[in-house]
């Protein structure tokens, strides 16, 4: 009986958040262990189904860098990185699109549909809803920077109660162009801004932003982030994550979250509890 009462209490505790977030758009950047570990995949799908069922509108943007590198190595195609960004040659671009749009995207869509969601996979090339330009063609090849997002494509899918799953491939306005490989974090932040999402949530392999003692920092502002960058507290791979958060905030997203995707049901714990489990980034 005690366990049953606890279940009821958990539902009651979540109710204010369910009411608050009903009909709101949440953009979720899906990556890291949550995307590769089978048990975590199942928990992620359950979380998305629950969000979907209670009236929240999840939009998923996924990465796939590890699998891209794995396939490139298998095919003996050289791949290099500059400042953490992949150099995308024409040969690499072909594999990037194959893996992101043709492999990982469909795997996620199938996973969600098998759990009862109504998911549909798209890339920025579909209806040219994401267009881009070269970041620096001489240096990065077909690695791109987003120029424009047409939010109506995703809004139409949401209106029809689909869960959009977006592969970070952008179109070019040039006929016959292979398109652009887009950093998934930055793609997610741009999509969130274009959709005027309530939240953007990044699933990572870290608890969030940590201080110099390794303790979780639960709340950050742009001013605090700049200070922590200067003193080296925020460094390495966390820099592009917080930059993506700030870009989303600047585009009008209310809150950005960096959470540990290795924790089962991390999305629900962050969204439906007062304390959350990760770092939230606020405007101002």
From Swiss-Prot:
Principal subcellular localization: cytoplasm
A Pfam family reported for this protein in Swiss-Prot or TrEMBL: AA_kinase
Residues noted as binding substrate in the record, renumbered to the chain: 64-65, 86, 181
EC class (word): transferase
Site residues, Transition state stabilizer: 29, 241
GO annotation terms (biological process): arginine biosynthetic process via ornithine; L-arginine biosynthetic process
Catalysed transformations (reactions): N-acetyl-L-glutamate + ATP = N-acetyl-L-glutamyl 5-phosphate + ADP
Pathway listed: Amino-acid biosynthesis; L-arginine biosynthesis; N(2)-acetyl-L-ornithine from L-glutamate: step 2/4
Enzyme Commission code(s) on record: 2.7.2.8
InterPro entries: AceGlu_kinase-like_sf, AcgluKinase_fam, ArgB, Asp/Glu/Uridylate_kinase, Glu/AcGlu_kinase, NAGK-C
GO cellular component, one term: cytoplasm
Signal peptide limits: none
Compartment(s): Cytoplasm
Swiss-Prot/TrEMBL keywords: Amino-acid biosynthesis, Arginine biosynthesis, ATP-binding, Cytoplasm, Kinase, Nucleotide-binding, Transferase
Molecular function via GO: acetylglutamate kinase activity; ATP binding
Function: Catalyzes the ATP-dependent phosphorylation of N-acetyl-L-glutamate.
NCBIfam families: argB (TIGR00761)
Family designation: Belongs to the acetylglutamate kinase family. ArgB subfamily.
Protein name, as recorded: Acetylglutamate kinase
């Amino acid at each position: 009986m005690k366990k049953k009462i606890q279940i009821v209490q958990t539902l009651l505790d979540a109710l204010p958040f369910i009411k608050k977030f009903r009909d709101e758009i949440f953009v979720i950047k899906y990556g890291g262990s949550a995307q590769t570990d089978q048990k975590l995949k199942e928990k992620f799908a359950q979380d998305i189904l629950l969000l979907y069922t209670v009236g929240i509108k999840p939009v998923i943007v996924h990465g796939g860098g590890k699998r891209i590198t794995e396939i490139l190595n298998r095919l003996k195609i050289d791949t290099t990185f500059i400042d953490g960004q992949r150099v995308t040659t024409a040969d690499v671009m072909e594999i990037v699109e194959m893996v992101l749009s043709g492999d990982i995207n469909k795997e996620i869509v199938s996973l969600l549909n098998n759990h009862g969601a109504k998911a549909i996979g798209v890339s920025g090339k579909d209806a040219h809803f994401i267009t881009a330009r070269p970041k620096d063609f001489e240096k990065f090849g077909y690695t791109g920077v987003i120029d424009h997002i047409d939010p109506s494509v995703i809004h139409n899918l949401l209106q029809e109660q689909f869960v959009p799953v977006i592969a970070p491939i952008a179109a070019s306005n040039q006929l016959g162009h292979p398109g652009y490989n887009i950093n998934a974090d930055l793609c997610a932040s741009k999509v969130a801004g274009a959709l005027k999402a309530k939240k953007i949530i990044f699933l990572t392999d870290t608890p969030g932003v940590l201080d110099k003692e390794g303790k979780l920092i639960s709340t950050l502002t742009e001013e605090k982030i700049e200070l922590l960058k200067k003193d080296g507290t925020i460094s390495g791979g966390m820099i592009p994550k917080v930059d993506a958060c700030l870009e989303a905030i600047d585009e009008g997203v209310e809150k950005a979250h960096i959470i540990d995707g290795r924790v089962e049901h991390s999305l629900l714990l962050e969204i439906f509890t007062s304390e959350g489990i990760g770092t939230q980034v606020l405007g101002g």
